[in-house]
Amino acid sequence: MDYPATFEFNAPERVARWRVIGNLILSIPHIIVIYLLGIVGTVIDVLSWIVIVLTGKLPAGLAGVSCMLIRYQTRVGVFIVFMRSSYPPFDFDTSSQDNGKDPEVTVNFEPELEGRSRLSVFFRFILLIPVVIVGMLWGILAELAAIVAFFAVLILGRWPKGLLNFIVGVNRFSVRTSAYWSLLTDKYPPLGLS
């Protein structure tokens, strides 16, 4: 693993045309859960920041909750943009390694628990500025790609390969950025999509 957070997606060959709208409607319960977990995630991020700055260590329990949150959000995000047909599980496993309950989306982490850079963590918000700017650009391009994919899937019943690869890359970038933001690693996330 070259970065301590990975995203893998097994794309289906065909996507039912109704999923371009149906998946968004079906994901409403997950969106509510993500909203509530987002509140928990904010508290966990603040606690992690305080603990790492004071001790130089990240407790495994805090890291596990962050891993679960990122994994859950990623699985639901892939479903919302109609890249998959199976309904994402309501899975709240806090292990760093994916438990395999969702065979289409795999998100693994290798959180750094010991020997953390207190200085890097202390200034994390400043260090994130370039990543956030690049992430906003990738996000805008991903929204445009999703609009094109909406019509492509509606007409063809499948994702065009180039668009699919681009959206998978943006998801990979998002998982890495989230791991850095959530203090799971001090390794700066690559700004590319590979």
Task: Label each residue range with its predicted role.
Residues 1-194:
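Membrane-proximal intrinsically disordered regions of secretory-pathway and membrane-system proteins
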